[in-house]
Amino acid sequence: MKNISLNIDKVAGFVSKETIAAYEPQVKACMETLENGTGKGNDFLGWLHLPSSITAEHLADLKATAQVLRDNCEVVVVAGIGGSYLGARAVIEALSNSFQWLKAKQDGPVIVFAGHNISEDYLFELTAYLKDKKFGVINISKSGTTTETALAFRLLKKQCEDQLGKEMAKKVIVAVTDAKKGAARVTADKEGYQTFIIPDNVGGRFSVLTPVGLLPIAVAGFDIEKLVEGARTMETICGPATPFAENPAAVYAATRNELYKDGKKIEILVNFNPKLHYMNEWWKQLYGESEGKDGKGIYPSAVDFSTDLHSMGQWIQEGERTIFETVISIENPEHTLQVPSDSENLDGLNFLAGKRVDEVNKMAELGTQLAHVDGGVPNMRLIVPELNEYYLGEIIYFFEKACGISGYLLGVNPFNQPGVEAYKKNMFALLNKPGYEEESKAIQARL
């Protein structure tokens, strides 16, 4: 079976392969730091060998709970924010029919998301949609006090109990939370919810392969064994025994750091398949939270091509030359569709008649890459044989491992996120949360 692969040929005109190869000692040292747990954030390295440590029994437990939700729910709401929902959503959206919502007959419960914003309109419309429906909730929160998720869960818990009764609600509400402490744990134990544990040594943005991601993905009807198998394969490929030049995570980390040193401060993750939109969003958090600190870090941006070629294409082609692109390139689509012939040919597209739509998309991808390289934008390609659970597992672990290496190359702690607390403190002060009286006075004086 083929694996995903990284092609950096279109970086050669900007950074030589010899320069990238010279990173080998530094990358090796970073990988040893990860393996030995001697670097910054070493208490959050549970993701490193997670794929190979996941047992068949654990997956069976997750699938059994997922089946309960599938059997009893028309809709399942995944409540979480950031790493507590983006990974699951990335996989689910990548594997789902683009028009799943519109299908008259569903293959399982509709999966919707909450707790990732504080929009009154969104939550009102969600609760209205859930009215009179049999719905369940997967509440994903280590603490149970993250404002966005806790607020959404408070609304959903009440509605679920009101519509289904407390006994059925107990059956269809599942908590993914801390093993022992926190408001979500206390509530789950009190109400008798089924629970799964978020490991203490796995941070949110690295948690896709824990119950945080695996349970919602299983509820959506996708094969979590294959997902883990793909990640397990990439754990080996990206491991310390693989030579530098054959290790895609090592080469990716080295290349992006050299480009950063060369003044390329923005990385744009590109896809040519709209199903990968939320994979882009997951990647943005993974790298943004991991590297954006101490006044350093590549800014992670993302685009959906060819759509965004008609909005961001001009800037990428001719704007400030501080960018590079990484393209997720899918070799084989799931479906086959040919361009028909038209007798009038008013649109002038008969030269495409008989060709697959994917061939047109592939030429758009190739043409874009060449144009951007000519315009001064280095390009890397992550080549993926097809979109399925196995290869998504490979993609997830590849990006996670490269992120750990890249953060250490940059000289930061890739496993903390102190900056995200600043807005919370201000918000709590403005809301007059108990314990924030002094902060409230100080912030009111600034308004």
Swiss-Prot record:
UniProt keywords, alphabetically: Cytoplasm, Gluconeogenesis, Glycolysis, Isomerase
Source taxon at top rank: Bacteria
Broad class of the protein's primary localization: cytoplasm
Keyword DNA damage: no
Active site per database record: 289 (proton donor), 310, 424
Protein name, per record: Glucose-6-phosphate isomerase
Disulfide bonding pattern of the chain: none
Keyword Isomerase among UniProt keywords: yes
GO terms for biological process, alphabetical: gluconeogenesis; glucose 6-phosphate metabolic process; glycolytic process
Matches recorded under PROSITE patterns: P_GLUCOSE_ISOMERASE_1, P_GLUCOSE_ISOMERASE_2, P_GLUCOSE_ISOMERASE_3
Single GO cellular component term: cytosol
GO MF, one annotated term: carbohydrate derivative binding
Encoding gene (name): pgi
NCBIfam families tied to this protein: PRK14097.1
Entry's EC annotation: 5.3.1.9
Catalytic activity entry: alpha-D-glucose 6-phosphate = beta-D-fructose 6-phosphate
Subcellular location: Cytoplasm
CDD domains recorded: SIS_PGI_1, SIS_PGI_2
InterPro entries on file: G6P_Isomerase, Phosphoglucose_isomerase_CS, SIS_dom_sf, SIS_PGI_1, SIS_PGI_2
SUPFAM superfamilies tied to this protein: SIS domain
Family of the protein in this entry: Belongs to the GPI family.
Pfam families, A to Z: PGI
Pathway assigned in UniProt: Carbohydrate biosynthesis; gluconeogenesis; Carbohydrate degradation; glycolysis; D-glyceraldehyde 3-phosphate and glycerone phosphate from D-glucose: step 2/4
Protein role: Catalyzes the reversible isomerization of glucose-6-phosphate to fructose-6-phosphate.
